[in-house]
From Swiss-Prot:
It is found in: Cytoplasm. It is an enzyme of class 3 (hydrolase). Residues 4-127 form the RNase III domain. The active site is at D44, E116. It catalyses: Endonucleolytic cleavage to 5'-phosphomonoester. Residues 154-223 form the DRBM domain. Homodimer. This is Ribonuclease 3. The gene is rnc. It comes from Campylobacter concisus (strain 13826). Keywords: Cytoplasm, Endonuclease, Hydrolase, Magnesium, Metal-binding, mRNA processing, Nuclease, RNA-binding, rRNA processing, rRNA-binding, tRNA processing. Digests double-stranded RNA. Involved in the processing of primary rRNA transcript to yield the immediate precursors to the large and small rRNAs (23S and 16S). Processes some mRNAs, and tRNAs when they are encoded in the rRNA operon. Processes pre-crRNA and tracrRNA of type II CRISPR loci if present in the organism.
Length: 223
């Protein structure tokens, strides 16, 4: 593992207790007595609060349901993995040899967990203000266009992030049928959650119909 002082420079924060940072970067695969799972648990809660606060202040006219969708689009594995990559966190992780050989340093799940753990460690040592300063700066670097229209464009992704976060399920899409001449064919798609139909839409392609069905489902969920 590389020198942690280099990581601290990337992070913009010097730990008083280096063992806390070591714990945050230690994956459970190492079988060490201390790994980053507990710090990840704490960091997850801290990031959920800070992103919610950030959105609340940034979007003063957006309703609660829409803020929940924005938060789900930012507080998730992919988003946190991107922020971890900005810090080159993968280079500093402590992994088992098996996980190392399996490409663990670039896995979204491992990077995301480590990012949350590091934020949890900073919270323990320096408090909420310091975590806010570091995490929101990173968030804006990775997502310079944090606005409702930009993040909601891909309704399928936004819906999946919301349903995973709130229900623990992933939407499925079922082709009901197609109709019309070949040069102007339309497709009807049903969207299901846990096997129950939530919405249905028609589009000029399967992809468009899926996006429309996801948009309808998002509107229903936020009510």
């Amino acid at each position: 593992m590389k020198n942690l002082e280099e990581f601290e420079r990337n992070l913009g924060y010097k730990f008083k207790k280096s063992e806390l940072l070591e714990e945050a970067l230690t994956h459970k695969s190492t079988k060490q007595a201390l790994n980053n799972e507990r710090l990840e648990f704490l960091g997850d809660a801290v990031m959920d609060l800070l992103v919610a606060e950030y959105l609340f202040k940034k979007f003063s006219k957006i309703a609660e349901g829409d803020m929940s969708k924005l938060r789900a689009a930012l507080v998730n594995e992919k988003s946190f993995a991107n922020m971890a990559r900005r810090l080159k966190m993968g280079e500093f992780l402590r992994l088992s040899q098996a996980e190392e050989n399996n490409g663990g340093r670039e896995k979204d799940s491992i990077l995301s967990d480590a990012f949350e753990a590091v934020m949890g460690a900073i919270y323990l040592e320096a408090g909420l203000l310091k975590v806010r300063e570091i995490s929101i700066s990173l968030l804006e670097l990775c997502y310079p266009q944090i606005d409702f229209a930009h993040l909601e464009k891909d309704y399928k992704t936004a819906l999946q992030e919301v349903t995973q976060a709130t229900l623990g399920v992933i939407p499925t899409y079922e082709l009901i049928g197609s109709f019309g001449p070949d040069h102007k064919k339309e497709f009807e798609i049903a969207l299901l959650l846990n096997g129950k139909e939530i919405s249905r839409a028609v589009g000029s392609s399967k992809k468009q119909a899926q996006q429309l069905a996801a948009k309808i489902a998002l509107e229903k969920i936020k009510k």
